[in-house]
Amino acid sequence: MKVLAVEPPSGELVQGLRSLDDGYIPPVFEKWGGYDLLDGKRIVRPRESIEYARRLADECGIFAGLSAGAALAGAIRVAEQLSDGETATIVFIVSDAGWKYLSTGAWTDDLDEAAANAESIIYF
């Protein structure tokens, strides 16, 4: 088993996520082993987070938030990096809901516009 963190680039915001490099260490992360638990990290930009949150809703009927979109983007990236013939069971956690973002344009604006707005809006 491997455990990978998904986070935005240092200094950027993905709502619901912060870069570990920016100094915020979630208490639950420390409680269960912190950096010793991680086998690696995947960096996900705000645009990808919105894009994959939209895909969760459109393709799977899961109305999740932007951090869940980031988690899906990271999981897909891991799957794409598997060698030919290599198999894996990849699990990601949907940790928030889309209702918090209804008034922000994350679901209705053009993707590029929503991504630009996401970098300057604090959703909650």
State what each model feature region is.
Residues I76-F92, W99-A114, A118-F124:
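Catalytic phosphate/nucleotide-handling subdomain of diverse soluble enzymes
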Residues A53, A71-A79:
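Buried hydrophobic packing segments
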Residues M1-L66, G105-F124:
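Active-site/ligand-binding loops adjacent to catalytic centers
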